[in-house]
Design a protein with these regions (language model features):
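Core catalytic alpha/beta fold that binds nucleotide/phospho-ligands
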Residues: 1-178
C-alpha cells in the first residue's frame, strides 16, 4: 500500500511586520481571517500565518477563495498525519532554529478544498471539477468512501520571526488510514 499524498505549505514572516498588520486590521481583520469559532481562540498572528501556510499548501488562492475555507477544529488530525507533521516540524525547526510548539487541526472546505482535491487525487481519478466532498471509490465493505480534505499545522515564534507549517491531506471516511 502506498503512503497517502499530502500537500505542504510553509510561512516564515517577521513577527513585528505580522503583529503590525494584525494591529492595524483589528476586529475587521479578525472577522475577515477567522471564523466565529476561531475568534474565541484569538485571531492574531497565529491565524494569519497558519492560514498563509495552508494557502500555499493548496496551491494559492483559487477562484472563490475565502479565509474561512480553513477553520481550526478541536479534533486531532488523522493518526498517521501526526508523525509526518512532527517530522516535518522538526526539520523546519532545525533549519530555522525555532521550535514549532503550537499546533492544531483544520477543516478545509470551499474553493480551497476543491483545489486541494484536484492536487491530491491521482490523475486518472481526478474529476475536472471536484466538489469539496466527493464520493470516492468503495471501501472494503462496498460502501462509498467520503473524500474530504483536512489539514494540520504547527507554528512557533522567536528571534523576531514567526514560522508556520501546514500539511493538507485527504481524510477518507470508510477507509482505514495507512
Amino acid at each position: 500500500m502506498s503512503a497517502p499524498a499530502v500537500l505542504l505549505g510553509v510561512d516564515i514572516v517577521e513577527a513585528d511586520r505580522l503583529a503590525a498588520a494584525v494591529g492595524r486590521g483589528g476586529h475587521l481583520l479578525a472577522r475577515h481571517v477567522a471564523t466565529a469559532a476561531e475568534r474565541s481562540l484569538g485571531a492574531g498572528p497565529v491565524a494569519v500565518s497558519v492560514k498563509e501556510s495552508l494557502i500555499k499548501a493548496v496551491g494559492g488562492r483559487p477562484p472563490g477563495f475565502t479565509w474561512h475555507d480553513f477553520e481550526a477544529v478541536k479534533e486531532p488530525p488523522a493518526a498517521w498525519a501526526r508523525p509526518l507533521l512532527d517530522e516535518a516540524a522538526c526539520e523546519l525547526a532545525d533549519s530555522t532554529g525555532l521550535p514549532l510548539t503550537g499546533g492544531a487541526a483544520y477543516r478545509v472546505r470551499g474553493a480551497s478544498a476543491r483545489a486541494a482535491l484536484l492536487r491530491l487525487a491521482a490523475p486518472e481519478n481526478a474529476p475536472e471539477k471536484a466538489p469539496a466532498t466527493a464520493a470516492g471509490s468503495s471501501s472494503p465493505g462496498g460502501a462509498p468512501r467520503s473524500r474530504t480534505v483536512a489539514a494540520a499545522a504547527r507554528w512557533g515564534e522567536g528571534g523576531g520571526v514567526f514560522v508556520s507549517l501546514a500539511i493538507v491531506y485527504l481524510a477518507e471516511k470508510g477507509n482505514a488510514c495507512p
